[in-house]
Swiss-Prot record:
GO CC list: small ribosomal subunit
Family per similarity comment: Belongs to the universal ribosomal protein uS7 family.
Function: One of the primary rRNA binding proteins, it binds directly to 16S rRNA where it nucleates assembly of the head domain of the 30S subunit. Is located at the subunit interface close to the decoding center.
NCBIfam families cross-referenced by the UniProt entry: PRK04027.1, uS7_euk_arch
Natural source organism: Methanosphaera stadtmanae (strain ATCC 43021 / DSM 3091 / JCM 11832 / MCB-3)
Cross-referenced Pfam families: Ribosomal_S7 (PF00177)
One MF annotation (Gene Ontology) recorded for this entry: rRNA binding
Name of the featured protein: Small ribosomal subunit protein uS7
The keyword Iron is assigned to this record: no
PROSITE patterns (alphabetical): RIBOSOMAL_S7
UniProt keywords, alphabetically: Ribonucleoprotein, Ribosomal protein, RNA-binding, rRNA-binding
Cited InterPro entries: Ribosomal_uS7, Ribosomal_uS7_arc, Ribosomal_uS7_CS, Ribosomal_uS7_dom, Ribosomal_uS7_dom_sf, Ribosomal_uS7_euk/arc
Superkingdom classification of source: Archaea
Length: 187
């Protein structure tokens, strides 16, 4: 028996093309993306949580939506519906493409040597790449929804669509490029 996400979209046909992210973008078949926080106590267990639920959890991190899982659930469901209506594609595939396009590969870290701090470029772990990507997408969507007539779901759908096309108008793509540019300058 095959389950569809929100009883609408089949996740078995979704593919992750970025080889580094394949083990960290979970596409398990579930109807309701809500694990009740079972993954919290184990170190890398969040990579086994559905990518859609992780997007919901990132939406809940903003001040206005803190802890409001039902609100985040409806925002994500509506956003996926909008994406499906606009593109006629599986919206989970569009989300995965957006995550791949906005996941930075390099960032800087501070090294202190001899009392002097240096910025050096380091590769980012795949788990952190997915986290940063989802964070960029949700932050961009929530910022554009603030004091705007558009709903949060519409703004999230727009951000995901722009990010999946690697459009430079996307907040997430801009943040990724900024992070990688800073890392390149630290070489």
């Amino acid at each position: 028996m095959s389950f569809k996400l929100f009883d609408k979209w089949d996740v078995t046909e979704v593919t992750v093309e970025d080889m580094g992210l394949q083990n960290y973008v979970c596409l398990d078949e579930i109807v309701v993306p809500h694990t009740m926080g079972r993954h919290v106590k184990r170190q890398f267990a969040k990579s086994k949580v559905s990518i859609v639920e992780r997007l919901m959890n990132k939406i809940m991190r903003t001040e206005r939506n803190s802890g409001k899982k039902n609100k985040a659930y409806s925002i994500v469901e509506d956003a996926l519906e909008i994406i499906n209506n606009k593109t006629k594609q599986n919206p989970v595939q569009v989300l995965v493409k957006a995550v791949e396009n906005t996941a930075p590969r390099e960032e800087t870290t501070r090294i202190k040597y001899g009392g002097i701090g240096y910025q050096i470029a380091v590769d980012i772990a795949p788990q952190r790449r997915v986290d940063l990507s989802l964070g960029f997408i949700t932050k961009g969507a929530m910022q554009s929804a603030f004091k705007n007539k558009k709903s949060a779901a519409q703004c999230l759908a727009d951000e995901i669509l722009l990010a999946s096309d690697e459009d430079s108008r996307s907040f997430a793509v801009q943040k990724k490029e900024e992070k990688e540019r800073v890392a390149r300058s630290a070489h």
